[in-house]
């Protein structure tokens, strides 16, 4: 395994012995606690050859797509001395150097990243992400902490989202192939999604779509949790199997609509379809008065 590592913040006031035994994750040394935690500084790091980002701390990440690699950190001396950044097997890892993070300043740690492409973002900490991702093939988002994708546009062929924490996606997405979502936490999609292909959603948590998911193709949804969202489907199939609470509006221009309701299902369906089938085994309220079934 090839590893390139930068030991950040080797200030004159911090001896090399303060950074020993990194793998054992000892508590923050007093030397680090005594560093300046008011003046904000910025450091450039010689890190390159990565296509993925993995975060395990509380941080803001600003990403710019560029032909050249660059990584820099911005924060107080005290915060930077506790951050550890390294590239391992193509992944830029952002983590704590010590067992705990000591910070008496309100200024958040920031990382500025430039790279030709990013196809994976993994978060186990508290991450605010800013930046456009123009990826021709795929993008995989994995979250087990608190993740806000605050600003930017995603353009990709295939997108997968696996969430076991709190995930807010505030930016639009343009997907040319397919979208797969597995949610076991809290997931909010607060902007439009356009998918020119298929959508597969498996929800076991809380899932909200505040605007609309536009699909040219097919959608398959299994819901065991709480789901609230709107779809616009032009294509083949829309199928939902609900075992939890499912509240949705569907604007359809498709071949087939199938609803299996084993929980609480509340839907308004408008537009046109060639066929609709409803299997009512729960508490079901589906309004199809504005739906035209074509002969």
What are these regions (language model features)?
Residues 1-295:
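Intrinsically disordered, low-complexity terminal regions
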